[in-house]
Amino acid sequence: MRTVVWQSLSETQQDAILERPAITEGANITAAVAEVIAKVRAEGDAALFELTEKFDRIKPESIRVTEQEIEEASARLTAKMKQALEQAYANIAKFHNAQKPTPIKVETQPGVVCEQVTRPIQKVGLYIPGGSAPLPSTVLMLGVPAQIAGCRKVVLCSPPPIADEILYVAKLCNIDEVYNVGGGQAVAAMAYGTESVTKVDKIFGPGNAYVTEAKRQVSNDFRGAAIDMPAGPSEVLVIADETADADFIAADLLSQAEHGPDSQVVLVTPSVLIADQVTDAVQKQLKQLSRASIAEKALASSLIIIADSLTQAVSISNYYGPEHLIVQTKNPRELLPLLDNAGSIFLGDWSPESAGDYASGTNHVLPTYGYTRTYSSLGLADFSKRMTVQELSAEGLKNLAPTVVTMAEAEGLDAHKRAVTIRVEKLTARS
């Protein structure tokens, strides 16, 4: 890990060390994904079978996972695993249930009533990556809010073979359809539909560069589907003072570093002693990890920043805007009102990032790459949409008419003006 003293750097140097690595889409990825999308749109299920065999080296008997297969997968899980998944489900459901919006109804002036109502997005698609380890936690983070929001149709795609844990959580979340398909072809299938896969309105979930690019492309096509948020490498920033536990900090940094070689890992502290202790602790703990080689690559570009105060540490964090922000200080809650840009915040020694990743109740689908300045943690609102309603009485329109007419005249929109005056004239004729 590289250690730098913030005050010793010029403004240009400060910007440079906090700059994230470029997300390399590359013309080859863009073109390859466009080709996959076009093929799925043209050939439907046949393309899904062909591409699954090509990329996943598996020839599934069926694209859709049957109810029987889901039941059999559930039966194979241990009681311990089921209990863990069910507790995580309960906590996530409790937190997301609390996010249900309150209807708004306001009389802005006599006879003019304005409302805001919320409706679920009707059809949503959930993408769950494959890889060496199953990600049932991601199914929970996407499936639970979709269930609570009341989405009419929830579709899940994941590369085959789909892990038993994923299928069990799909059952917990009452997901309607599960498909043995991954990669850009899964995104295309959900965005445009095939003979088997339902076309959805919005697609959620992480993935590799090809999945990310496929989501970008379908979201830019009005015939495609909306997506949850832009994606980039995973990140953690830790703010720590001299009271922090160096072993805890090291464990948190490594839990992020093991995600991948492009993971962003940053410690900001006013304590040189803590910086040194964390450096030593990271090296000791690294040797115990099964994914040490991956974590080591991430650590090669990681940072320890020596700030002159906690106030400056907060300022650095707000500028960087991390996906995960861990605060290990004497009074962490005192800093919370000062923290503006972060996907999810973990306060105090006993709040590891892992808790939020799996089971505390918050959502682990978070903005990265500095998007925390404008994007939020995934939540119930992302599976819903707002509509406004207005209802004017005759007297309400009569009282509001002069304002609307004056503004319509100023904008030169005669038909807008006439839509009001024609009504006022009829009211006048009746009286």
Curated annotation (Swiss-Prot):
Signal peptide positions on this chain: none
Binding site for NAD(+): Y127, Q185, N208
Catalytic activity: L-histidinol + 2 NAD(+) + H2O = L-histidine + 2 NADH + 3 H(+)
Keywords of this entry: Amino-acid biosynthesis, Histidine biosynthesis, Metal-binding, NAD, Oxidoreductase, Zinc
One Pfam family here: Histidinol_dh
HAMAP family for the chain: HisD
Record protein name field: Histidinol dehydrogenase
Organism: Vibrio vulnificus (strain YJ016)
Gene name, Swiss-Prot/TrEMBL: hisD
